[in-house]
Amino acid sequence: MDETEPVTAAHVKYLAARTRGDDAFLRELKAAARKSSIPEIWIAPEQASFMQILLKLRGARRVVEVGTLAGYSAINLARALPPDGRLTTIELDETRAEFAAAWIARSDVADRIEVRRGDAARILPSLADASADAVFLDANKTGYALYLQQARRLLRPSGLIMVDNAFAFGALFAKGPQEGEVEAVRSFNEVMARAPGFHSVIVPIGDGLWVGAREP
């Protein structure tokens, strides 16, 4: 058969039930984030596990994240790094950055994570060329194309690019005009599919995850 069974909600539930989930600390972090009115748009636990495996296979030591939110993904990714690994996470929203920094400080990987507060469009250019083994984008979708350009510069050969929300919050195939973020994702997906210097694929996990390798 040329066609495979489409991924359904049942598949997603099945996958999640057979993937390492959150520990007590991460569950507590999420509960506190909800009480602080931080939107529940962090990555899924099964997506976190998948990304951790990718980082371990890559032997990543330096990671850059754009979009800290509550710090959930930063902590997960940092846990996949060696003891001397380093993750720099960038967050524009001051309230979210403050919340994330407080919880990261309490985590078991506090010494591996640096929270940079401000606009990624200004912070990314200050980072050194070929200084990262992986870059994760999970911020404003209208900025993805610009962040991808910076990721190309930052990544070492064979470095990983990972980009969240390729399925546009479940609205990728919705008919008619959509809100700005959905249209931005649709546009970025076309850019990413043809981006020079990257070999990439969308993985149907979470809200869709772009995974690519920086080509020499």
Predicted stretch roles:
Residues 1-134, 141-162, 166-216:
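A short alpha-helical cap/connector motif
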